[in-house]
């Protein structure tokens, strides 16, 4: 009786649709389901945890991550999209649709659907504008930057830089940012994209002469393989590419 009191009053009016496993229930209302199924549903507990908008965002991220255990696990960027909502989040989602960026950065089918492309836009601006704050944890660095960026961010200037960088790279790299592989290595992406942006900020131009050769250079490979997320290696690979783009 108590369950009925707090239950969904119009449950009998709902019709099941698009079930892929229990297809025999498609088109049926709750009252037409087998009694044992109805009973199991009514007796099932649903755990609800409320994440307050007033909570510290890092706390919300950590709690969201702990709750994210069953079913399809969300990626860090999918969680960020839920926690750090606002203008900057919307901005990186829009830039992720940039055609030059899509053609230049090749991802797996799974990555195309799990927020990876949006995270790469986030990485671009985080390393471009706030590299000094990076220590070792990429996840924490991106979380911190996503929160900071929403407070004050020059959207028009940043969009211009992003579009110019990937327009130039797409023209210079018909096979995309790669070392002969089908998909773009994320560390190489950071080095090339951010290095190009830094060169553009300094000279308002990006020299791509010889890029298809030096992108496979042994020195750059050294900085983009192995323990690649040390601050020293992140800085060295970005500076290596910046120097090349400056000519």
Predicted regions and their residues:
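Basic- and aromatic-enriched surface patches that contact anionic nucleotides/nucleic acids
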Residues: 1-139, 220-228, 246
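Short amphipathic alpha-helix initiation/capping segments at coil-to-helix junctions
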Residues: 56, 114, 155-162, 181-189, ...
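Short alpha-helical "patches" and their helix-cap loops
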Residues: 78-82, 134-150, 203-220
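Eukaryote-specific, cytoplasm-facing alpha-helical/coiled-coil scaffolding segments in long proteins
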Residues: 91-92, 147-153, 194, 218-224
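Small-residue-rich helix-loop
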Residues: 134-177, 181, 188
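C-terminal hydrophobic structural anchor segments
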Residues: 166-220
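Acidic, carboxylate-rich catalytic segments that either coordinate divalent cations
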Residues: 210-247
